[in-house]
Amino acid sequence: MSSRGPLDERETLARDLVTASYLKGDFVLRSGKHSNRYFDKFLFETDPELLRRLGKYLSTLVPLTTQRLAAPELGAVLLGGAVSMETGLPLVLVRKEPKGYGT
């Protein structure tokens, strides 16, 4: 508990995200560097209850005048989808590069 009293939802959510995704060990990062700590976002993104709670919290930060949400491919598709479902706003997926087939 914080000195302000019981944890509010934001603090509880932050604690639960860290509990689910913060890892200690020996990790090789994308840069090739080594780290003894790693935050694996896929661990919270694949937890339906945690993803739902995060989508609900983030939806409170979306301005009322927003017409569409956007999420970069792969990195934020699940999170963008969770916010989209909570707000009812359509989600646009942003590709790094155009693909040569389909839509």
For every predicted segment, state its role:
Residues 41-42, 72-74, 95-97:
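Fold-independent oxyanion-binding glycine-rich loops
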